[in-house]
Amino acid sequence: MVMTDGWIVAPPRVRLLVCGAADRGDDGAALVAAATLLPALSEAQRTLLEVRRCGQLDVDDLVGMPDGLAGLIIDVAIGVPPGTIVALSFDRLVAGDGAVGPRSSHALPVSQVLGLADALGHLPRGTFVGIGGRRFGFGQGLSRVVRAAMPAYRDAILVEIERLAT
């Protein structure tokens, strides 16, 4: 518990890691989702979150997370059809259980970053929620298919926030 202006505030339960680049087409999908989802959350829902914009996911974003704090990575994914939404647990991504999993559009795939955190003994409970992207060129906006899927992407993120917070 944390004391703020005389009020006792519970610590956040979910670290929301918002990945992507706004100037790289569909790579900015998670930024758009967060920018439109967060203001629509209730005060109670917002207090559950610690939000970090990470651009490219790094193992430092996960190492040292306090016990009880779950991770939620949102990012665009390649390797899944454009506009398709995927939600995979960190454990499943690390295990590489043979299922086709998304890869971040960044240099180091999400599964490898999670694997590093696991090797260091710091893999938190958590989920990756991605949306398949189509174009990633500099200066491009979101593709039509990603824009059309944005409401469902925000809904999937909210479902995971609520699930991980319990």
Predicted regions and their residues:
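N-terminal catalytic or cofactor-binding beta/alpha core of small enzyme domains
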Residues: 2-123, 128-133, 140-152, 158-166
